[in-house]
Amino acid sequence: MAIAKAEILDAIANMTVLELSQLIKEMEEKFGVSAAAAAVVAAAPAAGAAAAPAEEQTEFTVMLTAVGESKVNVIKVVRAVTGLGLKEAKDLVDGAPKPVKEGIAKADAEAIQKQLAEAGATAEIK
């Protein structure tokens, strides 16, 4: 039962889409594999090359690391930046180190970090 690869390819080329779908399902069952996983693995190297430059971080988190001496001013900045109420902002400041704002653009994160620094706090961007 020696069938040449060319004969197999010709048979597959002459199949309808429905017949190909059934063939794939039967092959998945017989060999215990998934055609979807193979397609993802085959596409991964091509996507990996294109995704390498896109790995630059686009979302940043501003972390309040230390309050400093002017706690009231820091609470005011946290309230202005986050829209939190007085109690929530105070709890955030008291619980430092904590994230002030997450998932924001780099420019926004730098502006918030600057405002916190001007209020006497120490903040970092992650």
Curated annotation (Swiss-Prot):
Transmembrane segments: none annotated. Gene3D superfamilies: 3.30.1390.10, Single helix bin (1.20.5.710). Keywords: Ribonucleoprotein, Ribosomal protein. InterPro entries: Ribosomal_bL12, Ribosomal_bL12_C, Ribosomal_bL12_C/ClpS-like, Ribosomal_bL12_oligo, Ribosomal_bL12_oligo_N_sf. One of its GO terms (biological process) is translation. Forms part of the ribosomal stalk which helps the ribosome interact with GTP-bound translation factors. Is thus essential for accurate translation. Belongs to the bacterial ribosomal protein bL12 family. Homodimer. Part of the ribosomal stalk of the 50S ribosomal subunit. Forms a multimeric L10(L12)X complex, where L10 forms an elongated spine to which 2 to 4 L12 dimers bind in a sequential fashion. Binds GTP-bound translation factors. This is Large ribosomal subunit protein bL12.
